[in-house]
Amino acid sequence: VWHGWTPTDLIFPFFLFIVGVAMSFSFAARGNAPQLRKVLVRSLILFGLGVFMAAYPRFDLTHLRIPGVLQRIAVCYLAASLLVLYASRKTLYWTLALFLLGYFLLLGSDLTVEGNLAARVDRFLLGGHLWKATWDPEGLLSTFPAIATTILGYLAGERLRPNENVEKGENGHEKAATLFAAGWALILGGLFWSIWFPINKNLWTSSYVLFTAGAALQFLGFLYWVVDVKKWRGWTYPALVFGRNAIAVFALSGLVAKSLILYKVERRDGSLASLYQLLYENAFASWAGPLRGSLLFALATVLFWWIAMLVLYRRRIFIAL
């Protein structure tokens, strides 16, 4: 299905949204300290890591995919940071509106897989360096509305941070209610806009930006109310273990999976299979069947990496950029 969404389509925009939220707290904590150099270095490392993961293990530059998940995070973080640090609040709002409305007008009525303007721009500028032969979900034009997602996260973080509203008597329940209300407004706005501009993750349509940012606001409001207002924090420990080394676990899990797929082993019948395939077949599918085996394999992979990150967490090893 090209248009529409599934729960998995919330993961990436939620991450970009929380990048924006984190920017608000990070920039405020540093005060007037120089921040541009740190932003540039962090963005370059993220982008470079994304390209390295795309190239690994063959490092064939002929058809190396240039866009990617980490590359988009890097560009969105850099662009949003520059706007936040050097543009006025009014300019920030106008830029947000320009990215959403401009993208809507640019794409026009042709939103087909290969015929949309974003895909045509990617083919023209990036040629064979795309995820698919004719398009890329992390392409060039669709990065602009993705930046808007990050900006919305920053604005949410500004609302969430302790400020003068606390001194005026605003309590945590009211702040959580504000986040919920804003979330509903964005969700409804996204659904309404989707009548003309369908919700589409691969195109990162403007309706998708509003819808997912609204959902992220709802989730953020819920977590804020549960963790910071009600002080129910013990259940967050598993997520905290992953969260303190989020980029590390993303990169390492991807590189290990590629390595297991790369190396082939000869079966008894003489056919070749990757270590990844053999692990799945022998440890899970052989007794649980292909469907349940696939689920169990995925859960076991998550558990393996959680334990690995737990070791780092307990040793206070946090790989930060």
List PLM regions with ranges.
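Alpha-helical transmembrane segments and their immediate juxtamembrane cytosolic regions
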Residues: V1-L321
